[in-house]
Amino acid sequence: MSTTAAIQASNISVTFGHRTILDKIDIEIFSGQVTALLGPNGAGKSTLLKILSGEISSTGKMAYFGVPQALWQPNELAKHLAILPQQSTLSFPFIAQEVVELGALPLNLSHQQVSEVALHYMQQTDISDRANNLYPALSGGEKQRLHLARVLTQLHHSGDKKILMLDEPTSALDLAHQHNTLRIARSLAHQEQCAVVVVLHDLNLAAQYADRMVMLHNGKLVCDAPPWEALNAERIEQVYGYSSLVAAHPTMDFPMVYPI
């Protein structure tokens, strides 16, 4: 597994009014890993993801693949970094495949190539049967899978420098598609050396698919470790205020969290 730092962020702080959202966060995101951002509501997970993606600014320093954030041209960075937000608003009556093809805008591809790449990722995300449906007619879960196909399309020609950020990508999905989405993310990390950052609420999903867990609490980074080190009853009580039992999965090598 690569130890290349795809993102380096130091002394990241964000304040809204009198409220501190993030407080002096230092974090590196590595190629070849799935990093899960965890914590209760309001902990700062989505804000940190937006800072790491460059969507919002903060104090501190940021670099992608060793190059300071300020030196990246937006069009060039878009070839290497894609983000799936919690909600993607689109009111125009595009057909589904056209939405996915929007991900190819930063790429220098022919119309035929764009169509082929879009359909490839629609098949991966199990949404190809809706290719000719109008976007507004899709269900919430179908839209979420469609936008996942769009951001995967965006990274199609990113080579060995790619970052995928997913903000609660399983929130509208059924059980099978939750696991399919995270299997895709893990495959990108382990097979294509993508740096994957995913915001999740389900600790058991995070334990199964993440290489590394970063926990936030009241805007502070309180844990950065592999699942077996990160998950214990004391820490879950500290971060979530909830009593739990942590035990090994009966057949697979990851910890499970059981409420008590």
Curated annotation (Swiss-Prot):
Residue numbers binding ATP: 39-46
Enzyme Commission code: 7.6.2.-
Bilayer topology term: Peripheral membrane protein
Stretches assigned to the ABC transporter domain: 7-243
GO terms for MF: ATP binding; ATP hydrolysis activity
Membrane among keywords: yes
UniProt keyword terms in alphabetical order: ATP-binding, Cell inner membrane, Cell membrane, Membrane, Nucleotide-binding, Translocase, Transport
A Pfam family it matches: ABC_tran
Transmembrane segments: none
Subcellular localization(s) per the UniProt record: Cell inner membrane
CDD domains from the UniProt entry: ABC_Iron-Siderophores_B12_Hemin (cd03214)
Coiled-coil regions, chain positions: none
The keyword Membrane is assigned to this record: yes
Cellular compartments per GO CC: plasma membrane
Family: Belongs to the ABC transporter superfamily. Heme (hemin) importer (TC 3.A.1.14.5) family.
Annotated function: Part of the ABC transporter complex HmuTUV involved in hemin import. Responsible for energy coupling to the transport system.
Description of how the protein assembles with itself and partners: The complex is composed of two ATP-binding proteins (HmuV), two transmembrane proteins (HmuU) and a solute-binding protein (HmuT).
Name under which the protein is recorded: Hemin import ATP-binding protein HmuV
Organism, as annotated: Vibrio anguillarum (strain ATCC 68554 / 775)
Gene from which the chain derives: hmuV
